[in-house]
Amino acid sequence: HSYPKLSLDYSNLLASCPGYSEEEALEHFQHGKLPQEHCGHLKGSWYDEKLMVSPLEERCEISFRYTAFGEILAGSSLECKEASLETIKRLGLNASSLQRARRTVLEEIISFVDELSDEELLNLAQDLDKPDDEGKYVRFYSAIVYVLKALIFPHK
């Protein structure tokens, strides 16, 4: 623990995905395998202030890019690239189960983008980039927003 005084400070706590779903764990255990860990389970106690990209940081948005296949990549900013790659690796953000889940959500969105104008796509991206009335975001919203903006502004 790098900052023991902050261990239970509410402003220092982040919710993390469980590492794998119950269904995924059961399926793996039935076949005598361990599920592929990701997120907090894989991260454990690792923390490096210079190499960890927190979702609370402003640089988080530029630190990652997404493909329509659900893969997460380091952002194009050279100053963030090393931290982005290390965060992806340490949290297992390209675990096959996460890629599949992101791809499923992205395929659903992509299935109707041809029906929308660029302005409507931009409005959708802006709406998804904000929490709802309960302070929650749509699952994989950052990937959805990235892909929508890439469709609107393909050369950025």
Residue map of PLM features:
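Proteins with a high burden of low-complexity, intrinsically disordered sequence enriched in S/T/G/P/A and R
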Residues: 1-6, 35-40, 45, 78, ...
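Histidine-centered nuclease catalytic patch
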Residues: 1-36
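Conserved aromatic-histidine-acidic binding/catalytic patches
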Residues: 5, 52, 132
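Short, Lys/Arg-enriched charge-dense amphipathic segments
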Residues: 10-19, 69, 142-149
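A broadly tuned preference for mixed-charge, low-complexity surface segments
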Residues: 29-47, 118-132
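Conserved, surface-exposed functional patches that form binding/active-site neighborhoods
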Residues: 33-113
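C-terminal, charged low-complexity interaction regions
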Residues: 77-156
